[in-house]
Amino acid sequence: MDVRQGIHSEHAKALDTAGLRRHFLVENVFAPDALSLTYSHIDRIIVGGAWPATRPVEVPASLGAEMGVSHLLARRELGAINIGGPGWVEVDGQRHAVGTEEAIYIGQGGQGVVFGSDDHARPAKFYLNCAPAHTAYPTRTITLAQASPETLGDAATSNRRTIYKFIVPDVLPTCQLSMGMTKLEPGSLWNTMPCHTHERRMEVYFYFNLAADAAVFHLLGEPGETRHVVVHNEQAVISPSWSIHSGVGTQAYTFIWGMAGENQVFKDMDHIAVADLR
């Protein structure tokens, strides 16, 4: 497991390109037939991917020892969104079907977690976020139709997009984890602009549906000290609460957002005018 320490904004603004990438970019989210995880000290979120390319991928019991508990979800909850072919997730001996662009929430205490594909010619790919939890809520799946869609932006400002809120209080209860997916329409390039911060939670963006020769220029940093990280397909960026999180691509793309912290109200944001960015 890759462990990332938290970082102060005063330190972050002094970093060069390599330093910014080392602290904030998760380059290798997926590995075939493996569970890849990055542990951030920022709100103790775990970011990762399970890719059952040729065989099922099990959450190993050894992860519990790394976390100082009996098993990974002994004091955590987990959300996963499938960006690949149809698949399934087994929890406590029960198998749950999770189709393409569908999600599953696994409550605190879940054991025997296994990720699988229906067809290895088109394997599932599960992007996951995992956060500390204090209460056990039921495991359940969420379809795209159930994900509280909201369309925002305008083609004239190159940011027409639909937000699918899979794991939010209006859909199901969680301790603190929120997750969703934003799909940009063809010709739209910007996400989350005008941008914002949120003092009461952190966020991770995971970008996908990008061609091999495409990229997203992800903006981060304090509003008056912005920096950028170049992100390619199926890579993630960690955003502390003090940082903006926005981006512009060389083509339209999709991204998954995940948040952990003390407030789950989706609109709890500190908005920043474009004129105030530096």
Swiss-Prot record:
Short name of any one Pfam family annotated for the protein: KduI
Domain of life, source organism: Bacteria
InterPro entries documented for this protein: KduI, KduI/IolB_isomerase, KduI_N, RmlC-like_jellyroll, RmlC_Cupin_sf
GO terms of molecular function: 4-deoxy-L-threo-5-hexosulose-uronate ketol-isomerase activity; zinc ion binding
CDD domains: cupin_KduI_C (cd20491), cupin_KduI_N (cd20294)
Reaction equation(s) it catalyzes: 5-dehydro-4-deoxy-D-glucuronate = 3-deoxy-D-glycero-2,5-hexodiulosonate
Gene Ontology biological process terms from the UniProt entry: D-galacturonate catabolic process; D-glucuronate catabolic process; pectin catabolic process
Needed co-factor(s): Zn(2+)
Recorded metabolic or biological pathway in which this protein acts: Glycan metabolism; pectin degradation; 2-dehydro-3-deoxy-D-gluconate from pectin: step 4/5
Binding positions for Zn(2+) per the UniProt entry: H196, H198, E203, H245
UniProt entry keywords in alphabetical sequence: Isomerase, Metal-binding, Zinc
Keyword Metal-binding: yes
Cofactor info, note text: Binds 1 zinc ion per subunit.
Record PANTHER family: 4-DEOXY-L-THREO-5-HEXOSULOSE-URONATE KETOL-ISOMERASE (PTHR38461:SF1)
Family designation: Belongs to the KduI family.
Function comment: Catalyzes the isomerization of 5-dehydro-4-deoxy-D-glucuronate to 3-deoxy-D-glycero-2,5-hexodiulosonate.
Protein name (record): 4-deoxy-L-threo-5-hexosulose-uronate ketol-isomerase
Primary gene name: kduI
